[in-house]
Swiss-Prot record:
Protein name according to UniProt: C-phycocyanin-3 beta subunit
Main location: membrane
Taxonomic lineage of the native organism: Bacteria, Bacillati, Cyanobacteriota, Cyanophyceae, Nostocales
Gene: cpcB3
Residues that, per the record, bind (2R,3E)-phycocyanobilin 1: 83
Induction cue: Phycocyanin-3 is expressed in red light under conditions of sulfur deprivation.
InterPro entries in alphabetical order: Globin-like_sf, Phycobilisome_asu/bsu, Phycobilisome_asu/bsu_sf, Phycocyanin_b
Annotated source species: Microchaete diplosiphon
Amino acid sequence: MVQDAFSKVVSQADARGEYLSDGQLDALINLVKEGNKRVDVVNRISSNASSIVRNAARSLFAEQPQLIAPGGNAYTSRRAAACVRDLEIILRYVTYAIFAGDASVLDDRALNGLRETYLALGTPGASVAVGIQKLKESSIAIANDPNGITRGDCSSLIAEVSGYFDRAAAAVA
């Protein structure tokens, strides 16, 4: 079940029959304080999604030209488009996780069973993982640009964003 950070904390406390701890409350208060930065990051990535995906795919195919060569897994424009579509879907679900402050939407809706699907299709998961890392590099560069974004330290949010991409890459590798 997909949960945001608030629902997850409440569900965990309820399952244990406990009140929310000071640490849990502090973490949720911090999440609220950081909300504008989170929205800014999601907006930046979403607004640049097509170029992020396009550049990640170009870079992946430049580094691994065997993928688009005859006999390669992304050979033919239809197969290459499917690869780009998959990168786009993963990026979209990463933005949902960033907004929610929780990876469950990414896990449940995008990553659960993806490795097995790629294995069944003969898709090289390691190549998909490289593509995801390229999405990460571009997304973080855009998110880290200090111009026109809520002021303040974004290092923990950027680390969180990085973690969602790493989680996605590990799920397919």
